[in-house]
């Protein structure tokens, strides 16, 4: 019976892993049979400009999420207050809103006649700031929840000891809470960055231009077909995978160094 249960677990796990892996692997592998088109896309300056714009916008949105999301994550992990569940619901709201709806909502606020866009010196519609706010909107819940989990995993008694030794709350935060939560914070930042790169629905509503990679892939698919979209999609998959693995390795090495120290 135990062997049967283990086999069932392995089978079901393999099916879901295959479901995730097969489309990605097929997209990349098929470029071996269409290598000329892949090289053409890989040597196209317009493609690289779009890819760099995508990564740059996602990086900015991630930095904003870290700066403003970390304090909120700490509050949610450490404090109890009336309406806390409401705040947590607001944080998770972008997860359940369809992304085209999110784009419309952002347009209402950041559009040229919107609540913020009407008087802001920044232009959001069809501009880089619009891409950033769209990426930030859909990715910030990932970062906040991951950072909150990190802060919650820190033994509160360590903070109390630091306070009894005369450290201020701010010093305790930066010398105890933050360092002990850094693995979750880095993981949250990586996932937030990756989520920003993959965003399409919200971005295309508020800022079709300048193009990001998902928008370019969509446009080429509509105008030229699947064969034209696949090389760019494969490039984005390979680059994102390389960066993601590199960041994971860096984080893993830091964990090993801390363990040896």
From Swiss-Prot:
Keywords: Cell membrane, Membrane, Molybdenum, Transmembrane, Transmembrane helix, Transport. Residues 51-247 form the ABC transmembrane type-1 domain. The chain crosses the membrane at residues 3-28, 47-76, 86-110, 124-154, 185-209, 231-251. Residues 29-46, 111-123, 210-230 are extracellular. GO terms for cellular component: plasma membrane. The keyword NADP does not apply. One of its GO terms (biological process) is transmembrane transport. It comes from the Archaea. It is a multi-pass membrane protein. The keyword Transport applies. It is found in: Cell membrane. Residues 1-2, 77-85, 155-184, 252-261 are cytoplasmic. Residues 193-203 are annotated as: Gate 2. InterPro entries: MetI-like (IPR000515), MetI-like_sf (IPR035906), Mo/W_ABC_Transporter_Permease (IPR053405). Pfam families: BPD_transp_1 (PF00528). Residues 93-107 are annotated as: Gate 1. The complex is composed of two ATP-binding proteins (WtpC), two transmembrane proteins (WtpB) and a solute-binding protein (WtpA). Belongs to the binding-protein-dependent transport system permease family. Part of the ABC transporter complex WtpABC involved in molybdate/tungstate import. Probably responsible for the translocation of the substrate across the membrane. This is Molybdate/tungstate transport system permease protein WtpB. It comes from Archaeoglobus fulgidus (strain ATCC 49558 / DSM 4304 / JCM 9628 / NBRC 100126 / VC-16). The lineage of its organism: Archaea, Methanobacteriati, Methanobacteriota, Archaeoglobi, Archaeoglobales. The gene is wtpB.
């Amino acid at each position: 019976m135990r062997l049967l249960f283990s086999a069932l677990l392995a089978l079901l796990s393999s099916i879901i892993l295959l479901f995730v892996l097969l489309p990605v692997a097929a997209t990349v592998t098929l470029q071996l049979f269409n290598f000329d088109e892949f090289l053409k896309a890989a040597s196209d300056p317009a493609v690289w400009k779009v890819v760099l714009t995508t990564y740059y916008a996602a990086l900015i949105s991630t930095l904003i999420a870290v700066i403003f999301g970390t304090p909120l994550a700490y509050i949610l992990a450490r404090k109890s207050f009336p309406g806390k569940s409401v705040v947590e619901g607001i944080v998770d709201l972008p997860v359940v809103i369809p992304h085209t709806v999110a784009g419309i909502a952002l347009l209402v606020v950041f559009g040229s006649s919107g609540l913020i866009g009407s008087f802001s010196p920044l232009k959001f519609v069809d501009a880089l700031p619009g891409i950033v706010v769209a990426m930030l909107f859909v990715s910030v819940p990932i970062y906040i929840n991951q950072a909150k989990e990190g802060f919650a995993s820190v033994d509160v008694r360590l903070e109390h000891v630091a306070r009894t030794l005369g450290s201020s709350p701010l010093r305790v935060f930066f010398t105890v809470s933050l360092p002990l939560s850094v693995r979750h914070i880095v993981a949250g930042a990586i996932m937030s960055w990756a989520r920003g790169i993959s965003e399409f629905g919200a971005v295309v509503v508020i800022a079709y231009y300048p193009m990001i990679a998902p928008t370019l892939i969509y446009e080429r698919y509509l105008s030229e077909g699947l064969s034209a979209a696949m090389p760019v999609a494969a490039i984005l998959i390979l680059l994102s995978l390389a960066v993601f693995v590199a960041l994971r390795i860096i984080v893993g090495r830091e964990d090993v160094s801390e363990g040896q120290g």
